[in-house]
Design a protein with these regions (language model features):
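Membrane-proximal basic amphipathic "stem/tether" segments
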Residues: 1-25, 34
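Polar low-complexity intrinsically disordered regions
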Residues: 1-5, 48, 197
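Serine/threonine-rich low-complexity intrinsically disordered regions
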Residues: 7-9, 20, 65, 69, ...
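Nucleotide-sugar donor-binding and catalytic loop/hinge architecture
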Residues: 17-26, 183-202
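Active-site and donor-binding regions of nucleotide-sugar-utilizing enzymes
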Residues: 29-183
């Protein structure tokens, strides 16, 4: 696979290219902090683009992100690096929805948009307890959380209760990587079963 070559300053060019999009074109945005992000986005991106026929933007900090060479006409991809161009991207974002698997929104240099009312969605990149691997308050500033299971929902609601936080919308989404493996395993078992039946018949 041949990746586009980015040189110094290209992240700012990519940011300007993104900022020229209409509000309709930039309505749904995914942000990938690293290569692992796509493991958690894949199912949702497929649902949005292939089943719901929606257009999305995919913004990444990874130079060799495979999505930068995607042939899917419903996906516009942008590389913004992980420096000041990324900081500006978040501060000036104009989108209806931003989906990411990076925690600590508003805790450090990654902030909510100062110019537009964006709805922020967090997707877990682990099945473990919220308290076992995330900093305190790591997901407090998101509007919607895609939870792996009931344990995440219970932990988040308890945290909101204890710290008197604004309730977030919680959706039981599952775990992308595991769900993909389960689907692949089910397909393999069906193929294996058919192969065995053919052997018996012959």
């Amino acid at each position: 696979m041949k990746f586009p070559k980015f040189s110094l300053g290209d992240n700012w060019k990519e940011l300007r290219r993104f900022e020229k999009l209409s509000e309709h074109e930039s309505a749904i945005v995914f942000y990938a902090e690293n290569k692992a992000s796509m493991n958690h986005f894949k199912t949702l991106i497929f649902e949005l683009t292939e089943k719901m026929n929606l257009e999305i933007c995919y913004v990444t900090s990874v130079k060799d992100d495979p999505m930068l060479t995607s042939q899917n006409l419903k996906i516009q991809s942008f590389y913004i690096g992980d420096g000041t161009a990324r900081t500006k991207f978040f501060l000036t974002l104009k989108a209806r929805i931003l989906i990411m698997d990076m925690p600590d929104l508003e805790k450090f240099h990654i902030k909510r948009s100062k110019v537009f009312h964006v709805h922020y969605i967090y997707i877990f990149h682990s099945m473990f307890s919220v308290h076992s691997y995330l900093r305190e308050g790591a997901i407090d500033n998101y509007d919607t959380i895609f939870c792996v299971g009931e344990h995440h929902k219970n932990e988040i609601r308890e945290t909101e209760k204890v710290y008197k936080l604004k309730p977030k919308k919680l959706i039981e989404y599952g775990f992308g990587r595991l769900d993909t493996l389960l689907v692949q395993n089910e397909k393999f078992q069906k193929i294996d079963k058919k192969s065995n039946e053919l052997i018996i018949i012959s």
